[in-house]
Regions:
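Bacterial N-terminal signal peptides
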Residues: 9-17
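N-terminal compositionally biased, intrinsically disordered segments and leader/signal-like regions
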Residues: 5, 20-21
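Bacterial N-terminal signal peptides that target proteins for export
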Residues: 1-10
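Polar/charged, Gly/Pro-rich intrinsically disordered segments
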Residues: 102-144
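Mature extracytoplasmic domains of secretory-pathway proteins
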Residues: 61-108
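N-proximal, solvent-exposed amphipathic alpha-helical segments enriched in charged/polar residues
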Residues: 2, 23-61, 72-73, 143
Length: 144
């Protein structure tokens, strides 16, 4: 009987290790130097896709977190970046195919001057965020 419980414990440990944290099911991050990571925006800033995260909310809706890096961006760029966020929503969020196969209801787009681990603060790295509701194939800006 002891041997059986040991096997169950080992199998359980492997299953737990292979299971992702809820809300972190998205595809692996694209390396910043990969051609697929480069994104064009109206402002002309050079953007690199850091990652796309899928986050299931408590109500069951799916949020996308599209995270980009723009090494040349400064705080002074912010006023001219609204069209960049809209373009990213239309060209990236609306066309993204979630791993979960649940249509995304919200897209939170962030642009930072350097990669920042999701969920951490980095006061020395400028970051800008915009949120959009994804509805009927359109991006609807959400003030937050």
């Amino acid at each position: 009987m002891n041997g059986t419980w040991s096997k169950v414990a080992v199998i359980g440990a492997f299953v737990a290790a292979a299971t992702t944290v809820r809300g972190q099911e998205g595809p692996p991050a694209v390396p910043l130097d990969a051609p697929a990571a480069k994104v064009s925006v109206p402002s002309g800033l050079k953007l690199l896709r850091q990652e796309v995260l899928e986050e299931t909310q408590p109500d069951g809706t799916l949020w996308l977190r599209l995270r980009y890096v723009a090494p040349e961006m400064t705080r002074d760029n912010r006023p001219g970046m609204q069209a960049d966020f809209e373009t990213l929503c239309e060209s990236e969020a609306l066309t993204y195919e979630p791993v979960t196969r649940v249509p995304a209801a919200q897209a939170v787009i962030s642009i930072a001057t350097a990669p920042v681990k999701f969920g951490t603060t980095a006061p020395d790295i400028p970051q800008f965020f915009e949120a959009f509701r994804l509805e009927d194939g359109t991006c609807i800006w959400e003030a937050f």
